[in-house]
UniProtKB/Swiss-Prot annotation:
PROSITE patterns: RUVC (PS01321). Belongs to the RuvC family. This is Crossover junction endodeoxyribonuclease RuvC. Disulfide bonds: none annotated. Transmembrane segments: none annotated. SUPFAM superfamilies: Ribonuclease H-like (SSF53098). InterPro entries: RNaseH-like_sf (IPR012337), RNaseH_sf (IPR036397), X-over_junc_endoDNase_Mg_BS (IPR020563), X-over_junc_endoDNase_RuvC (IPR002176). PANTHER family: CROSSOVER JUNCTION ENDODEOXYRIBONUCLEASE RUVC (PTHR30194:SF3). It comes from Saccharophagus degradans (strain 2-40 / ATCC 43961 / DSM 17024).
Length: 173
């Protein structure tokens, strides 16, 4: 059993999603969006991200943490803010002893939808379908759940690969 906390970072909205991986099945636990006030200074928003994620970690006790990597942004300032939001989230995870998996947006979409070029509505639809949800999750929450599902799929693939192949000095034999 592994509970994975997926996070879609942002300086104004940070999505989170928790998925339980049991016996090859994925079960929805919870999801939501941490909202910050645009009027707050960036350090205050980063504190909100950190404290909210620590609270979520303490409440749900996930065993693994997955987050989206920084991708191209509209501006250098946006990229820096996104990087700082990621940093606050990652520090919340490592402070609580969680291993961190990082995934590019294209890999997440490929893993969940089957296309790295999928749009937000396709991700929402597949997350709803894969987790048997009765309602469509908000965009940021759906992205976070997709990140958790990508992490689960990636880890399962690595375990299968390690069990079926032999490596010597880091190379496949």
């Amino acid at each position: 059993m592994a509970i994975v906390l997926g996070v879609d970072p942002g300086s104004l909205k940070t999505g989170f999603g928790l998925v339980n991986h049991v016996s090859g099945r994925c079960e929805y636990i919870a999801s939501g969006v941490i909202r910050m006030k645009s009027s707050d200074e960036l350090p205050e928003r980063l504190k909100t991200i950190f404290e909210s994620l620590v609270e979520i970690i303490e409440c749900y006790q996930p065993s693994e943490f997955a987050i989206e990597k920084v991708f191209m942004a509209k501006s250098a300032g946006s990229a820096l803010k996104l990087g700082q939001a990621r940093g606050a989230a990652i520090v919340a995870a490592v402070t609580n002893g969680l291993p961190v998996g990082e995934y590019e947006a294209r890999k997440v979409k490929q893993s969940v939808v089957g296309s790295g070029a999928a749009d937000k509505s396709q991700v929402q639809h597949m997350v709803r379908t894969l987790l048997h949800l009765t309602a469509t999750p908000q965009e940021d929450a759906a992205d976070a759940l997709a990140i958790a599902l990508c992490h689960i799929n990636t880890q399962a693939s690595l375990i299968r690969l390690a069990g079926s192949r032999q490596f010597r000095r880091g190379r496949l034999v």
